């Protein structure tokens, strides 16, 4: 059973053009979009219709959404991007920093703002208005990108971790595990303690083809956790966001942070609709993909 509250509609029409490189799969197109700082972001597209961009969560890459693409493709030109440092996207820029001893070292220049700019850059590369679906931390980036470009006509946010919590202690423990060669344990620790994904959901994730990539890329998660711990939710800003938004949540999601974030968005966004997937947690798209895709499609198509 799905609980619904009601909402609105409205679109901003803008146009742009982009060219893609065709892959061996004639239904799939892969391109690279340069973000504001020059980082190349990989995007894979399929289908026909208005553009729908999917922004994945904290671990994994665009392949995480491949099972859902055929469900969206009849209705949209659906594009799944690799966030910086994930999949085929570049990690991001480094800058030379001179110390007090005049020693020059290379330093990572990562920031959440650059993730916002990445999403906005991909959106701006697409023709016409763009729908954006963001899962978990990808939802934070999708939301903030809507303040950087007017081309986002609708948002779908699935449990973005927006609340002001410091998780650097978790990041420290994960870093020690990685240094000890316990990469998979570091990933499981993240999944259990931050989004509080259930053991059953983690077991299901381990069976997915994307799991080895999640383990291999767990280092990137450290910088994201540290940066997200500095993020501050601004309800006043959210009240000014004039973009129709579908908020998605699972009734069995255990994380108080994720629950509070959805409630905060419900209370502040002027044009929002909430759908709660009964019996589901943080990864409903894995267990009920058809229902998930139908819910998103109906909202984006104006049927709700």
Regions inferred by a protein language model and the residue ranges of each:
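Catalytic histidine-centered segment of alpha/beta-hydrolase-like enzymes
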Residues: 277-289
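Active-site loop/oxyanion-hole signature of alpha/beta-hydrolase fold enzymes
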Residues: 80-133, 137, 294
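Hydrophobic, aromatic-rich cap/lid helix
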Residues: 29, 209-234
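Conserved HGGG/HGGXW glycine-rich cap/lid loop of the alpha/beta-hydrolase fold
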Residues: 35-94, 128
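Helix-rich cap/lid subdomain of alpha/beta-hydrolase
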Residues: 160-209, 222-227
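Post-His helix in hydrolase/transferase enzymes
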Residues: 286-298
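Conserved hydrolase catalytic core segment
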Residues: 128-164
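Conserved loop-alpha-helix segment in the C-terminal half of the alpha/beta-hydrolase fold
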Residues: 236, 240, 245-280
């Amino acid at each position: 059973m799905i609980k619904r509250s009601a909402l609105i509609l409205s679109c901003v029409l803008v146009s742009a053009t982009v060219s893609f490189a065709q892959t061996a799969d004639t239904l799939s197109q892969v391109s690279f979009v340069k973000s504001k700082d020059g980082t190349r972001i990989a995007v894979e597209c399929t289908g026909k219709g208005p553009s729908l961009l999917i922004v994945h969560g904290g671990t994994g890459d665009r392949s995480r959404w491949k099972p859902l693409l055929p469900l969206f493709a009849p209705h949209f030109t659906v594009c799944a991007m690799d966030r910086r440092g994930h999949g085929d996207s570049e990690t991001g820029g480094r800058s030379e920093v001179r110390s007090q001893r005049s020693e020059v070292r290379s330093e990572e220049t990562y920031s959440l703002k650059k993730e916002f700019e990445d999403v906005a850059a991909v959106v701006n590369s697409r023709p016409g208005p763009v729908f954006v679906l963001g899962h978990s931390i990808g939802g934070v980036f999708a939301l903030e990108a809507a303040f950087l470009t007017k081309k986002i006509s609708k948002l779908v946010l699935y449990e973005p971790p927006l609340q002001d919590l410091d998780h650097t202690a978790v990041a420290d423990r994960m870093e020690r595990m990685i240094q000890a060669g316990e990469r998979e344990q570091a990933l499981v620790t993240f999944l259990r303690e931050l989004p509080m994904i259930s053991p059953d959901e983690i077991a299901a994730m381990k069976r997915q083809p994307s799991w080895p990539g999640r383990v291999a890329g767990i280092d990137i998660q450290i910088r994201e956790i540290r940066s997200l711990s500095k993020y501050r939710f601004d309800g006043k800003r959210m009240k000014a966001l004039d973009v129709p938004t579908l908020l998605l949540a699972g009734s069995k999601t255990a994380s108080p942070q994720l629950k509070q974030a959805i409630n905060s968005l419900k209370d502040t966004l002027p044009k929002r609709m909430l759908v709660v997937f009964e019996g589901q947690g943080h990864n409903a798209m894995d267990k009920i993909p058809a229902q998930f895709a139908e819910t998103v499609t109906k909202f984006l198509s104006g049927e709700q």
